[in-house]
Amino acid sequence: MKILLPYSTHFEVVKTDSSAKGKVITGGIEKFCKDLEDNIDGIIPVAITKQDKENRQTKRVIRDAIALHDPDMILFNNPWWSNMMMSFNVPLICIMHEPLVRDIRMVELGIILRDLNDSGCHIHFVSPDQLEFHRNMAKRIKDVQFGAIKGFINPSFLPDDMPYSSDLIYDVSTVGRCDNEKAPFLIHQKLRNSSDLNSLVMTNDGVYKSSTVNDYVQDNQHWTEPRHTMRGLPHSEVIEHISRSKVFCSTWPKESWGITAMEALGCGVPTILMTGDNDIHASEIVAASRSHYFKINRKCSGDEFETTVREFAITMKNRRDEIAEMTREKHSLSKWKSCIDKVIDMRYSDKNKSRSDLTEFFT
């Protein structure tokens, strides 16, 4: 079976030299594509470069790939490509990674998903919180009901060689694309008056279309020890540094799922989830136990955040083995691969026109 996987990124990726220990993964969507390419038989990746987009060649690149490979289906995770994808007359799977945000892009999303559903495309979300958010938004903004989805897909898994460390350097770390919404430097800002806690931000220096986001990149070049910052690291090094943290923090309440939260827990690192006023974070579904994470409002004071980091690290110090073991079992490669294979097989046979039991597959 041949599955075409077109993908793109939205900014220039920081380059690494040949001595780098691995590929730079700029975000969860990019990691999902790489995981598919590395682990699922029949995946044919089609990279849409920045130059392709600037030259308006996206459709041509994908059309040429279809002519070359004659795929059985197309799997894509950019719903704004929907009209183009439907024009190819190839069976479609759409993975909805979109976060829980309200911006101008989302105004038409309900209509897009409805039209995809009507066309026979199989749509999968990554978490129930994400589905509920987008259902409610589509109804409120456009009075649209986009219909039943096929189920939920975990966007990633934990490999067998996840690092585990007892040599802990950082009191708290985070990973995030360098933009003002994700706000990875929030942990530095919260701890700016603390002299004895080491915080680590791992991010990128992307070049974005938005001047606001580019300003955020430039405004956070000044941090110095004990506010550590590492940019453009290969994914393998990111995971190593996470494993050497006493606590990990997810700074964005609007995550659709939370791959880095899963990776942190898989390294045995207890995780702080920053929430909005609704006290909800989609990454709660990732943890193997409610005791493995702690929720705190993103608007908390620096003192409150510092106290949380200190106390949660002490409380969970002797449970890191448990956190790692339980999370790795819940998010094993074999379980993830089994679900992806089932998604592909279901699309290939196209026998089930209603919501499948994938809804319960990852509970």
Describe every region a protein language model picked out:
Residues 28-31, 36, 299-304, 314-363:
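A charged, aromatic-enriched C-terminal amphipathic alpha-helix characteristic of glycosyltransferases
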Residues 73-78, 85-106, 122-125:
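Active-site proximal beta-strand in glycosyltransferases
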Residues 104-146:
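A short, active-site helix/loop in glycosyltransferases that binds the activated sugar's phosphate group
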Residues 163-182, 188-200:
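Conserved donor-binding/catalytic core segment of Leloir-type glycosyltransferases
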Residues 212-233, 239:
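Nucleotide-activated donor-binding/catalytic signature segment of Leloir-type glycosyltransferases, i.e.
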Residues 239-245:
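Short alpha-helical donor nucleotide-sugar binding micro-motif in glycosyltransferases
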Residues 253:
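Aromatic "clamp/platform" in nucleotide-sugar-dependent glycosyltransferases that forms part
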Residues 270-280:
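Short hydrophobic beta-strand element within catalytic cores of glycosyltransferases
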